[in-house]
Amino acid sequence: MKNLILAIESSCDDSSIAIIDKNTLECKFHKKISQELDHSIYGGVVPELAARLHSEALPKILKQCNEHFKNLCAIAVTNEPGLSVSLLSGISMAKTLASALNLPLIPINHLKGHIYSLFLEEKISLDIGILLVSGGHTMVLYLKDDANLELLASTNDDSFGESFDKVAKMMNLGYPGGVIIENLAKNAKLKNISFNIPLKHSKELAYSFSGLKNAVRLEILKHENLSDDIKAEIAYAFENTACDHIMDKLEKIFNLYKFKNFGVVGGASANLNLRSRLQNLCQKYNANLKLAPLKFCSDNALMIARAAVDAYEKKEFVSIEEDILSPKNKNFSRI
């Protein structure tokens, strides 16, 4: 029975393939190969290196799931947004597979995929507020009853996750910065350093992390010798201020929209400090908090496969001749 969808994710520095049963939503296969160690020496993702590593990793993963090929009904792939050369690696493989197996091709928006990480084994729920925090994006969305997405707030500059990476790089801590900063902050012995919460007195429903990032840079310059204790203290102050900023604007949004359900997605949503604060906020406003499983917060192909199930039902197919590469976020107004 041809009821399986194979999905490919390669938008940044994770090579991933998943296979899902479109009828039961059962995950039949999922594998991810991370490039974090390869990019860590550079303090961030190097696009050309990422593309080369994708071209090596994706075929290796594909060989591990070829037993399912006979039951495939479609091929899905992340086509936007992301690094052009990384996206192209996955798209090229997807088109080759779709052509060779004579299957329909389904392009999936990466951010929609993150939203579906909340509903990997269940039907998607509408009328829900969503905080998306990742290395490339910070936004608050409202998924309405009619499946339209309303953007309530976004960042004017750096994203939440990106700011963690950049602060980690300033202190020569490595990449990715999210986990490094979070773990370092837990070891802070002193807590005398503080930073101002960005846009604290602004009515604008927006985020901005560039000023906070610069404040951290200036704090680092004050210290001739950046000891481990000082690094931990800076990490603690930065993480808490970044989370304060997220929560400050979220509280204003909650007051306006009175969410009954609220979800949190994206790689940076794995931050335990942020998760704890979100739980408190939802309790305060009697909202049900829905969290993506920690394993599937970061980029993965299973969320792309899950999004593809609904896209398959709507017959959102494209020709393999069509240019579907879209590094910018163009198709993100409706689920």
From Swiss-Prot:
One of its GO terms (biological process) is tRNA threonylcarbamoyladenosine modification. It holds the Pfam family TsaD. Substrate binds at L132, V133, S134, G135, G136, D165, G178, N271. It catalyses: L-threonylcarbamoyladenylate + adenosine(37) in tRNA = N(6)-L-threonylcarbamoyladenosine(37) in tRNA + AMP + H(+). Transmembrane segments: none annotated. One of its GO terms (molecular function) is iron ion binding. Its EC number is 2.3.1.234. The keyword Iron applies. PROSITE patterns: GLYCOPROTEASE. Binds 1 Fe(2+) ion per subunit. InterPro entries: ATPase_NBD, Gcp-like_dom, KAE1/TsaD, Peptidase_M22_CS, TsaD. Its cofactor is Fe(2+). It comes from the Bacteria. Fe cation binds at H110, H114, D299. It is found in: Cytoplasm. GO terms for cellular component: cytoplasm. Required for the formation of a threonylcarbamoyl group on adenosine at position 37 (t(6)A37) in tRNAs that read codons beginning with adenine. Is involved in the transfer of the threonylcarbamoyl moiety of threonylcarbamoyl-AMP (TC-AMP) to the N6 group of A37, together with TsaE and TsaB. TsaD likely plays a direct catalytic role in this reaction. NCBIfam families: gcp_kae1, T6A_TsaD_YgjD. HAMAP family: TsaD (MF_01445). Belongs to the KAE1 / TsaD family. This is tRNA N6-adenosine threonylcarbamoyltransferase. The gene is tsaD.
